[in-house]
Amino acid sequence: MKKDTYNHVLKYTGLLGGVQVFYILMSIVRNKFTAMFIGAWGIGLVETYNRAVDLIANMTNFGIGFSAVRRLSELHEQGKEEAIRIYIRLIRSWALVTALFGTLICLLSAPLLSYWTLSDFHTTKGFVLVAPMVGILAITGGEVAILKGLQRLKQMAAISALGALVTMLLTIPGYWLLGLHGVIPVLLSTTAAVCLLNLYATTRDYPYRVGLRSMKLMKSGGHLLKLGGAYILAGTIGSGAELIVRSYVTNSTSLNRAGLYAVGVTLIVSYARLAFVAMDADFFPRLSAAGDDRKRRNNAINRQIDVLVLLMTPFLIAFALFLPIIVRVLYTSEFLPVVSMVLCGLSFMYFKAVYTPIAYLPLARGHSRLYLLMEFLYNVVFTVLVIVGYHVRGIVGAGIALSLANLFDLINISLVYARVYDFRFERRTLLRCIVQYALLVAGIGAATIANWGVKLLLGLPVLGLSLWFAWNLLRKKTNIVDKIKSVIGRKKQ
């Protein structure tokens, strides 16, 4: 049974993670040209717009993209085609309402957003122009919920890959031809392109229809708003925390430093996130299905932690060792100051790999208030630590603060959910986490050495040991060896 569980986790992490590798490759090319054409100042401006749009979107989408999935998934499993069509119409109707509402809120709050983020009203026009992004994101969220509810994982993977390609093809010429004047056109066009790709995928089987004039239909969607309440509040708190931090960095220094901070966060978070892509689409439904079965819940969580930690650690060690080269390749030498920040912040992703499967427990059990409380506590700690860290030691202090924030979340979640849900780390899982983290710390220590010969002499054996632990577990707990032999056998024929 355990072997089947490991195979299942690895399968869906591989399916969606493989797509994320392509997504990351496209992002690498896009970010390289973005850095060349608009520099750190331009990236700071892009991130300011994105964080503000995310905040308004999370405040106004009522969590429909999350709350609609469970009911649609149930209808899909029951094979009730007519009910599915009606429910999809309901999702789209409410998504359109929230799209219009969110766009209006962004338009009205444009002066406030400009003053809050940049301490003046000079970018009010910019926030007005990006307001349609809020509406487009709401519509996209509804279509993504439809794909998730219908369990179209392969379609979602294809859209993600194609979306990354289209985004790159729109971004590079946009910044090349227009420079900083291309920021808003690029943001709008890329957001719209991803939305159209999702609409194309869903409308092939379910043509786009809404029922805004049907009061009966609209009233039946009340549960969508209630179920998504905690999710939207948590998202708003998270987006608000990010915006507060980035506004502080901008206002206390400059958009240039905000751009460096944004790149540092991207390097810490974005390229390691492929390990998490199967969480919403695969792990969450399995955890929800466990219900009151404590043993089954704990087994699912521990298996997920095992896979995440063993995938994450070798990647982070390799990333740390070659980080100066990576920064030069992905961006320009202007961004080399972020190397120290990223090295200090890599533990952020490791701790996230450990606690994320545990953090899904209240959502899987329908305990929205507890989920919201935990998110609120984390974001308060995150905001305070990063602001203090940046104030004391600049972007390096911010990197240290990011790691400390997630260490706090790991300890807090583990203690609280052990009491509420009787969650327990399995002894072997806990031992794996400790060993792999010790290897990560050793790898980061080696990465701080300036001499490349000494750095690689000390760091590569650490990386090899981490890879050996990962391979040893996968060899014992999955049929990965048989699959590799099968692929090699087919190629020889």
Predicted regions and their residues:
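Membrane-proximal transmembrane or re-entrant/amphipathic helices at the cytosolic face
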Residues: 445-493
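Hydrophobic transmembrane helix module of multi-pass membrane transport proteins
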Residues: 9, 13, 22, 93-243
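Membrane-interface junctions at transmembrane-helix termini in multi-pass inner-membrane proteins
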Residues: 135-159, 346-377, 417, 421
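Helix-loop junctions and terminal segments of transmembrane helices
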Residues: 62-77, 149, 207, 264, ...
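Transmembrane helical elements of multi-pass membrane transporters/channels
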Residues: 11-31, 43, 163, 187-194, ...
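Interhelical loop/hinge segments that connect adjacent transmembrane helices in multipass membrane
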Residues: 1-9, 198-242, 282-299, 420-434, ...
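Interfacial segments at transmembrane-helix termini and the short loops linking adjacent helices
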Residues: 110-130, 302, 320-350, 396
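Membrane-interface helix-loop junctions in multi-pass transport and translocation proteins
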Residues: 35-42, 151-154, 164-196, 200, ...
